[in-house]
Amino acid sequence: MHLSLILQLLVLLTLANGTPVVINRFLGRRLSYPIDGGVRFVDGKPLLGSSKTIRGVLFSVLVTAAGASLAGLEWNVGAVLGSVAMAGDLFSSFLKRRMGLPAGSRATGLDQVPESLFPLLACRHTLSLTALDIAVTVALFFVGEVVLSILFYKFHVRERPY
């Protein structure tokens, strides 16, 4: 198991998934354009929802790429982690809309696993990650994300404690 790499990845996954929340707190709805453009899926429900924005994805990728450089990894690894974490988040949102859950609603597991598992799988060969590295990182991210969400809420960064 690569403990130092797991720590680096946890920091980067937290940056990737936390950046859109922090940016939204500081910028509000300014420069906030929904990725789905307000389109509805064949079921009549929003494709992704208004909280998934181009701004959030772009900032996530840029901040995660910069964070990777600062953490001693290649910037492009950070860009891939950020991009695929956002793809996982969009996948979760798509599934949540199909389940009838509104934007911002909680779906424990679905809110944490794709946005951590997908990027780790995408970088597994580049970073020589083992199945154990991936499993431990996803589990730690899951717990950490739940704790950070509560803290973000307590410090008024997030509107809900999840």
What residue spans do the PLM features occupy?
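Interhelical loop and helix-boundary elements at the membrane-water interface
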Residues: M1-V80, M86-A122, S128-Y162
